[in-house]
Curated annotation (Swiss-Prot):
GO terms for cellular component: anchoring junction; cell projection; cortical actin cytoskeleton; podosome. SUPFAM superfamilies: Nitrous oxide reductase, N-terminal domain (SSF50974), WD40 repeat-like (SSF50978). The keyword Cytoplasm applies. Belongs to the WD repeat AIP1 family. GO terms for biological process: actin filament depolymerization; locomotion; sarcomere organization. Gene3D superfamilies: YVTN repeat-like/Quinoprotein amine dehydrogenase. Keywords: Acetylation, Actin-binding, Cell junction, Cell projection, Cytoplasm, Cytoskeleton, Phosphoprotein, Repeat, WD repeat. One of its GO terms (molecular function) is actin filament binding. This is WD repeat-containing protein 1. WD repeats lie at residues 4-45, 48-87, 93-135, 138-176, 180-218, 224-263, 270-306, 311-351, 358-408, 432-474, 480-518, 523-561, 566-604. It comes from Bos taurus (Bovine). The modification N6-acetyllysine is found at K28, K81, K95, K115, K480.
Length: 606
């Protein structure tokens, strides 16, 4: 019973206000890479739906850069670990690992022969190191700064030069190898966020939080000019990137614009205004072949259009925070995946192409905990902002209507025919009919965690933290406790009725899935063991013969109802991140989401 990965819809870059985001390009110009959490994400620049995720860092990764040869990538994390790994194979084998200093690595630069690496950041005893890639032997010292170094670059032609930019408002110029400190450049009045040599090595540029960009001679370090005369931008500048022919420079700023500069005549060629919201601040940029990319504070990746500066060619959206829940729905013959994340953001994806967007208008303001689609084709979602929302899936617009405010925080919801929604909250079970609250059980006597409604619409199953499942009946506008207890093997974490209503599957914190037979008075049908840690989600296949479970052990199992031994085990479905939610597109296609903020589609063969 094999499986294979069909599609990966990758996460967006992880961004932080006021901190520049480094986006690296590959030397051949086909792909770009960035980091999110413990992952390094590699994406095809022409078709960003093609993605690969590297997850071998134990800590949050800050920066990753291709070697000029294109065969290796160096990535550095917050603990000061630098990993150099292979790009040619799917396994991304580790070549070398170094710890140049103890503390966050903020930038990496290679020499053009891919033999030496400079690493800078916030170490305890030093802020940078430069060494041979294969032995780790030092090839110089990075000195001259008394605060954290934000950026480093090396001239890509001999004689080598190295330049750094720091929070002490200075840039420093080095000659080598071995690299020795030559002089400090103190033209900026605020933090220096980014320093970059032009591809031909003739010049380098420094960009700072003071809104200025200075151009210098690449060989001597002499100042050539200040772009734009005095100020290049009205806000701090977080990133710069040279054009491949070394004549133009792209800059990204907190004033919510990106600009293209003609360096030879010192003038602005284009100004891209990205919006007026604080989330439109520009924190990163990349110029690769004909593509101009910028990164917004929202995490969105913008493909800029030189011919129409007011509107990007395309904007890549998705999630930059961990995904908590998902659901799938067919609309107009297409299958869509809906995913909700920790920051209240809901995204929808075309399951075939990976084309995606977020809903229009103002939606949830906190973590989306559970989503499902009701009989009217509305997305029903509950969130830690204490609301349940009904969103029309043809309009995909959060309007003022369709919001139900609850007294306490909801954890899970389920919908049934006849306009019913059952919501379990902290210490409360609420029944909604036609988007109105009609009944609640205020002190159920246990802590309800999850809920499912039988496809027939009369029975509601509620799983509790006490390890029991209780059954309720929907009678008009009330819920009646049937007084029946089904015992799970531990605190219930998720439950679901099969689509034909014949079985109820219950998973728990004790790593077990128990299936009850509905027709036989909810007698225990089978028990499924295999997970190594708490199971958090499960979903039935449309064939009602198989169901999938995902857990904190990063594993997904696809079980066969009749035989617990016949199973598909997807190891490391989302490596280093537990699986947060599952759904089936069809009998052989499973969708998984995780705290790594990515969505994956798997083909399952029985």
């Amino acid at each position: 019973m094999p499986y294979e990965i069909k599609k990966v819809f990758a996460s967006l870059p992880q961004v932080e206000r006021g901190v520049s985001k480094i986006v690296g390009g590959d030397p051949k110009g086909n792909s770009f890479l960035y980091t999110n959490g413990k992952c390094v994400i590699l994406r095809n620049i022409d078709n960003p739906a093609i993605a690969d995720i590297y997850t071998e860092h134990a800590h949050q990764v800050v920066v990753a850069k291709y070697a000029p040869s294109g065969f290796y990538i160096a990535s550095g994390d917050v603990s000061g670990k630098l990993r150099i790994w292979d790009t040619t194979q799917k396994e991304h084998l580790l070549k070398y690992e170094y710890q140049p200093f103890a503390g966050k690595i903020k930038d990496i630069a290679w020499t053009e022969d891919s033999k030496r690496i400079a690493v800078v950041g916030e170490g305890r005893e030093k802020f940078g190191a430069v060494f041979l890639w294969d032995s780790g032997s030092s090839v110089g010292e990075i000195t001259g700064h008394n605060k954290v170094i934000n950026s480093v670059d090396i001239k890509q032609s001999r004689p080598y030069r190295l330049v750094t930019g720091s929070d002490d408002n200075c840039a420093a110029f080095f000659e080598g190898p071995p690299f020795k400190f030559k002089f400090t450049i103190s033209d900026h009045g605020r933090f220096v966020n980014c320093v970059r040599f032009s591809p031909d090595g003739n010049r380098f540029a420094t960009a700072s939080a003071d809104g200025q960009i200075f151009i210098y001679d690449g060989k001597t370090g002499e100042k050539v000019c200040a772009l734009g005369g005095s100020k290049a931008h009205d806000g701090g500048i977080y990133a710069i990137s040279w054009s491949p022919d070394s004549t133009h420079l792209l800059s990204a700023s907190g004033d919510k614009t990106s600009k293209i500069w003609d360096v030879n005549v010192n003038s602005v060629v284009n100004t891209f205004t990205m919006g007026s919201n604080v989330l439109d601040q520009q924190l990163g940029c990349l110029w690769q072949k004909d593509h101009l990319l910028s990164i917004s504070l929202s995490g969105y990746i913008n493909y800029l259009d030189k011919n129409n500066p007011s509107k990007p060619l395309r904007v890549i959206k998705g999630h930059s925070k961990s995904i908590q829940c998902l659901t799938v729905h067919k609309n107009g013959g297409k299958s869509y995946i809906y995913s909700g994340s920790h920051d209240g953001h809901i995204n929808y994806w075309d399951s075939e192409t990976g084309e995606n967007d977020s809903f229009a208008g103002k939606g949830h303001t906190n973590q989306v905990s559970r989503m499902t689609v009701d009989e009217h084709g509305q997305l029903v979602s509950c969130s830690m902002d204490d609301t349940v929302r009904y969103t029309n899936l043809t309009l995909r617009d959060y309007s003022g209507q369709g919001v139900v405010k609850l007294d306490v925080q909801p954890k899970c919801l389920a919908v049934g025919p006849g306009g019913y929604t059952v919501v379990v909250c902290i210490g409360q079970i609420v029944l909604l009919k036609d988007q109105r609250k009609c009944f609640s059980i205020d002190n159920p006597g246990y802590e309800p965690e999850v809920v499912a409604v039988h496809p027939g619409g009369e029975t509601v199953a509620v799983g509790g933290a006490d390890g029991n499942v209780r059954l309720y009946s929907i009678l008009g506008t009330t819920l009646k406790d049937e007084g029946k207890l089904l015992e799970a093997k531990g605190p219930v974490t998720d439950l679901a009725f099969s689509h034909d209503g014949a079985f109820l599957a219950v998973c728990d914190a004790s790593k077990v899935v128990t299936v009850f037979s509905v027709a036989d008075g909810y007698s225990e049908n089978n028990v499924f063991y295999g997970h190594h840690a708490k199971i958090v989600c499960l979903a039935w296949s449309p064939d009602n013969e198989h169901f999938a479970s995902g857990g904190m052990d990063m594993m997904v199992y696809v079980w066969t109802l009749s035989d617990p031994e016949t199973r598909v085990k997807i190891q490391d479905a989302h490596r280093l991140h537990h699986v947060s939610s599952l759904a089936w597109l069809d009998e052989h296609t499973l969708v998984t989401t995780s705290h790594d903020a990515s969505v994956k589609e798997w083909t399952i063969a029985y």
